Amino acid sequence: MKPVISGWDQGDAEAIAASDTGQLLAAQGIEATVEAIDACSPFRFKAPLSPDMAAAREGLGIDFDRLVGFCRQEVENTGDEETLFIEGVGGVMVPLTERHTVLDWIAELGLPVLLVVGSYLGTISHTLTAVMAMRTKHIALRAIVISESEESPVPCEETAETIKRHLGSATIEIVPRDGAAPAAFRI
């Protein structure tokens, strides 16, 4: 699920299908009905901005406690044999409200994180900064996934090695641009 999404275009079926929410539903074999969209992404905003800014443009805001409660309920409803992924929005320091960031949301949920990063120029700094920020809140990092960007200045393996050298024992997996995830990909 992706509880918060900005850049949402409710009136365009193609845009819905191409959105993160549409892609998540399609990957589960779920039709993008109003009910399915509400269940996956209840906090939707039109402007492609940080959620706090996008919500403000619509005269709205995100109720942080409601967001956390929604996610906790979904975790509770997930069976023992199921896996629930809660996709964030932007980076860990993206503002959700006037006082809360994605980092606060992650910390409040207390769930381990699968940090997905690109392989673009600057990703090493962004990744190390995100991990350091998570450490300040004692957030468990399950693994880092490097999703190969369209333009990677160096091979993803070099990026992974550099990140690993600075973080120590981090689990890092690489997903190549062609989408062929490693057969042994386990988190």
What are these regions (language model features)?
Residues 1-61, 73:
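N-terminal phosphate/diphosphate-binding loop that engages ATP/GTP or pyrophosphate donors
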Residues 2, 114-117, 142-148:
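Short internal beta-strands
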Residues 4, 89-90, 120, 149, ...:
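Anionic group-transfer/hydrolysis microenvironments
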Residues 20, 70, 102-105, 130, ...:
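A general structural detector for well-ordered alpha-helical segments in enzyme core domains, enriched
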Residues 50-96, 103:
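Phosphate-binding/switch loop-helix module in NTP-utilizing enzymes
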Residues 97-120:
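Inter-motif core of Ras-like GTPase G domains
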Residues 131-187:
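C-terminal lobe/tail of nucleotide-utilizing enzymes
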